[in-house]
Structure formats: C-alpha cells, structure tokens
Amino acid sequence: MLTITSYFGFLLAALTITPALLISLNKIQLI
C-alpha cells in the first residue's frame, strides 16, 4: 500500500510541477 500511495503522490506532484516549470520557462522566454 505504501508503494502505491507514494507512486500516486509522485505522479500527482509531477503533474502539478511540470506545468508550473513550463509556464515559468515561457515567461522567461517572453521577457
């Protein structure tokens, strides 16, 4: 159970962090 919850937690974190990084990179390129 711990491995499954940690896997989903990591997946959720990746899905939330990746768009934030892409948005920050796009803002840097616009400037």
From Swiss-Prot:
Transmembrane regions: 4-26
GO CC terms, sorted: chloroplast thylakoid membrane; cytochrome b6f complex
Entry annotated with the keyword Thylakoid: yes
Subcellular localization, as worded in the UniProt entry: Plastid, Chloroplast thylakoid membrane
InterPro entries (alphabetical): Cyt_b6/f_cplx_su6
Gene Ontology biological process: photosynthesis
One Gene Ontology molecular-function label: electron transporter, transferring electrons within cytochrome b6/f complex of photosystem II activity
Protein's UniProt keywords contain Chloroplast: yes
Membrane topology: Single-pass membrane protein
Keywords: Chloroplast, Electron transport, Membrane, Photosynthesis, Plastid, Thylakoid, Transmembrane, Transmembrane helix, Transport
Family per record: Belongs to the PetL family.
Role of this protein: Component of the cytochrome b6-f complex, which mediates electron transfer between photosystem II (PSII) and photosystem I (PSI), cyclic electron flow around PSI, and state transitions. PetL is important for photoautotrophic growth as well as for electron transfer efficiency and stability of the cytochrome b6-f complex.
Summary of subunit composition and partner proteins: The 4 large subunits of the cytochrome b6-f complex are cytochrome b6, subunit IV (17 kDa polypeptide, PetD), cytochrome f and the Rieske protein, while the 4 small subunits are PetG, PetL, PetM and PetN. The complex functions as a dimer.
This protein's name: Cytochrome b6-f complex subunit 6
Organism: Dioscorea elephantipes (Elephant's foot yam)
Gene name of the record: petL
